[in-house]
């Protein structure tokens, strides 16, 4: 039967619950545990798909097309054998929607629908379903203890601990142990009060993860244990690390996995973390440095491009290179030519995905620079669409545009997906008036690469599967004139024959793809497309 580890956070947000939980999952997996992870978000949005990247950061897309919290990206990157799906992330909005739909269908037989038991029962059912078929399920609760939005989730966890018993449920709580410079010491009082807040709603943590930017003394560890009713060995010190991939080793060296196995009655071999040691060694000891200029409109919040940032890091690890990302505001680049110096200093240029017209001319300016100056270029999603528009305008000399930016354009080289097949194979009509959450091409889909193309050489295969998140596609009637002018279509979707990628044969490295390869990159091996891109950047840097 599945065993559950619930993860909460206290004192402040952004302590790294997702990374810590994923690191623990990686250690358990290294011991042979079949482990999965789930994120519960207290906000009322049904999913993060239509939320602003400035507020929420990246939307991570799963294989089955769910638009989820960026923490699920961490989960997949730390785990080898468990892929996330729509059952691994749910919000208060989704829970309330499900309960209200049941009420409308009469499933509650006219009873009064309340937070307890109806909302909490729905939360519990989601948690149990997400853990089916696994040895251990790690459940992260978003937000901070004390937030009013989190209370139904906390109550559901309390009930599950009672119902499952000590041998099937544990609570791990992350807290901050701040360092007070004027006093020259770390303070335990915030942690004590955070646990007090938990206990006031009926929850007693079994494990405390104490985050700090300074060393926490053994005396303070004993003090925390004494005043929180947690075993001293279960008070785990987790100081700031040079690399997040050091965290599995940090947790293992403090015997956290042994404690969990003992509590759950699991007799397992020792964890083999040698892969993580190799990752950390390569990351912290690079042999070269390359700079990638990332031109986007959400650059004020790097988390908006979290998976791309990580994919570049992974490629750097693969090539023992320190990949520095120089973020360039696409909107500023439109009118500020002084930013061209950043493009000039870059060893490669990347234009990521995005929505809307704002900043597109700045991105096109960057693409033109990469094409004309033989700088390695990688376009992702919108980065591919704009590469096609740029080439059509400046090489074919036609006034091409996307119908996303100009509904009345005479040359719609990029157009809306107006018809689509759902998972049952039924035709779904989509238009500009449809709900934003229902007009997307989402999830893992197969693509067929043209034999002999650069992309086929990069992947070492002619058939690939990558994840999508977009509404607009390249218009196939422009394929022939583009190819006659030198831009090659190197990949098509397997079923709909939609354009998946383009490249330039007369350019050292110019590849643009409609899909999102960053979602499947791993620190242990990277991703072939990003690996090739960073290698091209290294070659460009060395040839300067």
Swiss-Prot record:
Pathway assignment: Pyrimidine metabolism; CTP biosynthesis via de novo pathway; CTP from UDP: step 2/2
GO terms of biological process kind: 'de novo' CTP biosynthetic process; pyrimidine nucleobase biosynthetic process
Keywords noted in UniProt: ATP-binding, Glutamine amidotransferase, Ligase, Magnesium, Metal-binding, Nucleotide-binding, Pyrimidine biosynthesis
Amino acids binding ATP: 14-19, 71
Activity regulation field: Allosterically activated by GTP, when glutamine is the substrate; GTP has no effect on the reaction when ammonia is the substrate. The allosteric effector GTP functions by stabilizing the protein conformation that binds the tetrahedral intermediate(s) formed during glutamine hydrolysis. Inhibited by the product CTP, via allosteric rather than competitive inhibition.
Domain Glutamine amidotransferase type-1 stretches: 291-543
Binding site for CTP: 13, 147-149, 187-192, 223
Region (Amidoligase domain): 1-266
Amino-acid positions noted as binding UTP in the UniProt annotation, renumbered to this chain: 13, 187-192, 223
Amino-acid positions noted as binding L-glutamine in the UniProt annotation, renumbered to this chain: 354, 382-385, 404, 471
Reactions mediated catalytically: UTP + L-glutamine + ATP + H2O = CTP + L-glutamate + ADP + phosphate + 2 H(+); L-glutamine + H2O = L-glutamate + NH4(+); UTP + NH4(+) + ATP = CTP + ADP + phosphate + 2 H(+)
GO cellular component, one term: cytosol
MF terms (GO), sorted A to Z: ATP binding; CTP synthase activity; glutaminase activity; identical protein binding; metal ion binding
PROSITE patterns reported for this sequence: GATASE_TYPE_1
Active site: 381, 516, 518
Family: Belongs to the CTP synthase family.
Subunit structure: Homotetramer.
Function: Catalyzes the ATP-dependent amination of UTP to CTP with either L-glutamine or ammonia as the source of nitrogen. Regulates intracellular CTP levels through interactions with the four ribonucleotide triphosphates.
Note: CTPSs have evolved a hybrid strategy for distinguishing between UTP and CTP. The overlapping regions of the product feedback inhibitory and substrate sites recognize a common feature in both compounds, the triphosphate moiety. To differentiate isosteric substrate and product pyrimidine rings, an additional pocket far from the expected kinase/ligase catalytic site, specifically recognizes the cytosine and ribose portions of the product inhibitor.
Name of the protein described by the UniProt record: CTP synthase
């Amino acid at each position: 039967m599945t065993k559950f580890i619930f993860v909460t956070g206290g004192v402040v947000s952004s302590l790294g619950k997702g990374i810590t939980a994923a690191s623990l999952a990686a250690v358990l997996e290294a011991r042979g545990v079949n482990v999965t992870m789930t994120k519960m978000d207290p906000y009322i949005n049904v999913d993060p798909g239509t939320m602003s990247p400035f507020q929420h950061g990246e939307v991570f897309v799963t294989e089955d097309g769910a638009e989820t919290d960026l923490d699920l990206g961490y989960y997949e990157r730390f785990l080898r054998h468990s892929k996330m799906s729509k059952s691994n992330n749910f919000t208060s909005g989704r829970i309330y929607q499900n309960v209200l739909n049941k009420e409308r269908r009469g499933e509650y037989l006219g009873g009064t629908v309340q937070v307890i038991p109806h909302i909490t029962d729905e939360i519990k059912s989601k948690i149990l379903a997400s853990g089916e078929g696994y040895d251990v399920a790690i459940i992260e609760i978003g937000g901070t203890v004390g937030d009013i939005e989190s209370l139904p989730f906390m109550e559901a966890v309390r009930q599950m601990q009672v119902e499952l018993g000590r041998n099937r449920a544990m609570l791990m709580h992350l807290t901050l142990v701040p360092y007070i410079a004027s006093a020259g010491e770390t303070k335990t009082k915030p942690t004590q009060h955070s646990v007090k807040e938990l206990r006031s709603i009926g929850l007693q943590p079994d494990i405390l993860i104490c985050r700090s930017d300074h060393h926490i003394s053994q005396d303070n560890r004993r003090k925390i244990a004494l005043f929180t009713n947690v075993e001293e060995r279960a008070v785990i010190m987790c100081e700031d690390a040079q690399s997040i991939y050091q965290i599995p080793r940090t947790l293992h060296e403090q015997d956290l996995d042994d404690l969990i196995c003992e509590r759950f009655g699991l007799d397992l071999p020792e964890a083999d973390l040698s892969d993580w040691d190799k990752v950390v060694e390569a990351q912290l000891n690079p042999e070269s440095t390359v700079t990638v200029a990332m031109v986007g409109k959400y650059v004020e919040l790097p988390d908006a491009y979290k998976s791309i940032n990580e994919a570049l890091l992974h490629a750097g690890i693969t090539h023992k290179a320190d990949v520095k990302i120089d973020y360039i505001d696409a909107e500023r680049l439109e009118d500020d030519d002084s930013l061209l110096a950043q493009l000039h200093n870059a060893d490669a240029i990347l234009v990521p995905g995005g929505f809307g017209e704002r900043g597109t001319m700045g991105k096109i300016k960057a693409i033109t620079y990469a094409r004309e100056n033989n700088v390695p270029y990688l376009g992702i999603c919108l980065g591919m669409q704009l590469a096609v528009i740029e080439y059509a305008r400046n090489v074919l000399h036609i006034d091409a545009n996307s119908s996303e930016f100009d509904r009345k354009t005479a040359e719609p080289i990029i157009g809306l997906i107006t018809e689509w097949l759902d998972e049952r194979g039924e035709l779904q009509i989509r238009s500009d008036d449809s709900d934003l959450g229902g007009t997307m091409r989402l999830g893992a889909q197969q693509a067929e690469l043209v034999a002999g193309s650069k992309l086929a050489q990069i992947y070492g295969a002619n058939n690939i599967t990558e994840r999508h998140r977009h509404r607009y596609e390249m218009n196939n009637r422009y394929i022939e004139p583009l190819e006659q002018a030198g831009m090659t279509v190197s990949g098509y979707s397997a079923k709909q024959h939609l354009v998946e990628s383009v490249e330039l044969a007369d350019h050292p490295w110019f590849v643009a793809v409609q899909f999102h390869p960053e979602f499947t990159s791993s620190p242990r091996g990277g991703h072939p497309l990003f690996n090739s891109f960073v290698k091209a950047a290294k070659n460009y840097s060395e040839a300067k």
